[in-house]
Amino acid sequence: MPASTLLLPLQLFLAAGWMRAGIEKVIEPDWWSGTALEAFLSAQDGQMLPLFVPFVDYVVAPWTVGVAWFVMIAQLAVAVCLGLGRFLRPALWTGVLLNVTFVMSGRVDPSAFYLVMEMALLFALARPTSRRFAMRRATLWSLAAAPFVPFVTTLHPAEVIHDPAMMMITLCWIAAITTIVRSIDRERLGPLAVPLWQAPTDAAEPPPVPHGRGQTFDRGAQRY
């Protein structure tokens, strides 16, 4: 069974989740005025990752109305694209951008789980790569986790799920490991590692078949 079919429940779940979040904001007047976003930022004060605070202060806070509109439209657009199965890569990367923003602002749940599902779909859509290229990507994912290490506040099993820095590190590690494993599967399976929806559909033209003395039969033209 193609991976696209096996992962369809994740795609539909994400579509429903983003649609719910978008509609929730559309019917809330305070989101249109930016007041709800200002209240959200105030509530998250002290919980944001320190490296994210300058972005909020100098980019989000002065443009709360525009950012609020962007979030509403982006959430609805992601939901529609995932629900219809169109523009999946742009939709998933937009979802990743939104969820990473929410996690770095201190709101880990449910964004961390959305990120895992979005990454699973993106890896399913990606073409297999060589092990050397996969190692480079895995290294980049590992380096992306490094800036969050100083901001880990707890390793307690009951609290670590609420630590935005630890969640970002975990997601980067998951991406790095998955990248390497996919490259190993490609080398082990060869052509079978290519998803069915990415396999070439145009078969090679068969060579002419000899037909009689000094003549050939052209299969494409159906003539002698």
Model-derived features: positions:
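Extended, low-polarity transmembrane helix blocks
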Residues: 1-51, 58-74, 84-224
